[in-house]
Structure formats: structure tokens, C-alpha cells
């Protein structure tokens, strides 16, 4: 296990602090090809009240060398085995000292260097979740994806977690369910909405989301996890199934048979 906390004199304390402290987290594992651009995107933010945490799952491919290269700009980083991305995200929430937390994982980027300043400088929020729009990065190019109004939550996911900021206190009280490998974020936001959690669309593009990696590595798991949830909770599972149904229409028939099998 490696656990690094930056000395106080290695963190820029010269600028006056803005109103709300934001924690940005990057979770990674063997991400040597993606991690540097994500780190650069985070440390280039002009907002001055940010802590940056990296939680690595015990990489062996050179990822740690890149993290060490930027260690003076990282508030804290740890490298140790974990039980998956959502276990690592829960771990980072326990480390966080900010009021809101954003997960910008390896391969994903902020829309530009002024995202945090545009949202938080000179402003203060009380909502449980702030969210915005996303640029989807496919292998062949980019596609804007506007956030939806929160009343669409019963039928679709209005935003992705890279384009959201969640109160740290809320995530500590209701951590991601690590029994899900791919859809714990969707389950978290849906359950928060159902329990009366408050959301605010900040009407800005926040993240550039690496969809190529998602589609190739995650969507199939997401689809079948959603089907399993549907068997246990038809309302929640049906909602999650619709999130990925459009991408896997050929699987629809067999998945419906699985969900409704006696």
C-alpha cells in the first residue's frame, strides 16, 4: 500500500479561498495511457479551493510513475487493492474534506479549465447534487449530450456522474452499493431522488466522458446487472434497463425472458 499526503507547503495557499471547497477524485487502475490527461485537466482548473485525491487500485503498468510526476499538485493519493471502482469511490469519500465531490476518473476530462470557477466562484449551494451537461467522446468523435430536467429521473438518467457534484455528507451516509459492478451510481442517484434528495442543473457543460471505454468494457455488464435488479425490484430495475436498452436491442428478447422467467 502507498499512501501519500502532500505537505502543506507543497499546496498553493497563496490565493484567497473561494466559498465552497470541492473535492475532485480520480479512480484508476492500470491506466497509464489515460491518467496523465485526466490529471492535467484537474490541476489546470482555475478555481482555487480544490483538493485532488487519486485512488489507485494497485497499478503495475507505470500509472504510479505518472502520479508521482504530479504529486506536488495532488492533495492525497493512495495505491492499494480494492473491490472495484465503486469501492474506491466510497473510499475517496471517506478521505474527502470538501463540501462537494466530483469523480473524474481516468480517461475523463473537465470541459475546460474554468468549469469549477464558473460553477462555484462567488456562489454557495445547498442542494444534495449539482449536475450539468456532458460531451460524449466516442472513438470517431464527440457528441454533446444535454442534461435533462430532474423530473425525468423516473424514465431516464438526466446526467452522468462525471458531470455531477454530490455533497460529501450525503455520499458518506449513503455510499455506493458495491454489489453492483457497473450501475451503482445510477442506483445511488435514483434512490436519492426517491427519498427526497435535492438536485440542481447548473446549465453548463462539465465533463468530456470517454464513452469508447464505457461501451467496450462496461455497457454489457450494466445491461445484465439492470436485468437482475429488475427481477428483484421491477420499478427500479425497469428504469435501469431502459438506460442501456437502446444500445443493446439484439439482447432485448433474451433479457426479457431472463427477467420474467419463472
Spans of features found by a protein language model:
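A transmembrane-helix-recognition feature enriched in membrane-embedded lipid enzymes
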Residues: 233-257
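Catalytic core of nucleotide-sugar-dependent glycosyltransferases
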Residues: 205, 217-242
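Nucleotide-sugar donor-binding/catalytic module of glycosyltransferases
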Residues: 1-218
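Short, surface-exposed amphipathic charged segments that create phosphate/polyanion-binding patches used
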Residues: 91, 258-259
Amino acid at each position: 500500500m502507498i499512501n501519500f499526503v502532500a505537505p502543506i507547503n507543497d499546496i498553493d495557499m497563496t490565493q484567497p479561498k473561494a466559498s465552497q471547497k470541492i473535492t475532485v477524485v480520480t479512480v484508476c487502475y492500470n491506466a497509464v495511457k489515460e491518467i496523465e490527461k485526466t490529471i492535467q485537466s484537474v490541476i489546470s482548473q482555475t478555481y482555487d479551493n480544490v483538493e485532488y485525491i487519486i485512488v489507485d487500485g494497485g497499478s503495475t503498468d507505470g500509472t504510479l510513475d505518472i502520479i508521482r510526476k504530479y504529486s506536488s499538485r495532488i492533495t492525497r493519493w493512495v495505491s492499494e487493492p480494492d473491490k472495484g471502482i465503486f469501492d474506491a469511490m466510497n473510499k475517496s469519500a471517506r478521505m474527502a474534506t470538501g463540501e462537494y465531490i466530483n469523480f473524474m476518473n481516468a480517461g475523463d476530462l473537465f470541459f475546460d479549465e474554468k468549469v469549477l470557477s464558473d460553477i462555484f466562484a462567488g456562489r454557495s449551494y445547498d442542494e444534495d447534487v449539482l449536475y450539468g451537461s456532458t460531451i460524449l467522446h466516442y472513438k470517431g468523435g464527440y457528441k454533446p449530450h444535454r442534461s435533462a430536467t430532474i423530473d425525468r429521473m423516473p424514465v431516464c438518467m438526466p446526467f452522468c456522474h462525471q458531470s455531477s457534484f454530490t455533497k460529501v455528507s450525503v455520499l458518506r451516509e449513503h455510499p455506493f452499493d458495491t454489489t453492483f459492478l457497473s450501475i451503482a451510481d445510477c442506483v445511488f442517484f435514483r434512490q436519492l431522488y426517491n427519498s427526497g434528495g435535492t438536485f440542481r442543473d447548473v446549465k453548463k457543460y462539465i465533463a468530456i466522458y470517454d464513452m469508447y471505454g464505457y461501451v467496450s468494457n462496461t455497457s454489457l455488464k450494466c445491461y445484465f446487472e439492470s436485468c437482475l435488479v429488475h427481477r428483484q425490484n421491477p420499478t427500479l430495475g425497469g428504469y435501469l434497463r431502459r438506460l442501456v436498452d437502446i444500445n443493446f436491442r439484439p439482447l432485448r428478447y433474451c433479457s426479457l425472458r431472463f427477467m420474467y422467467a419463472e
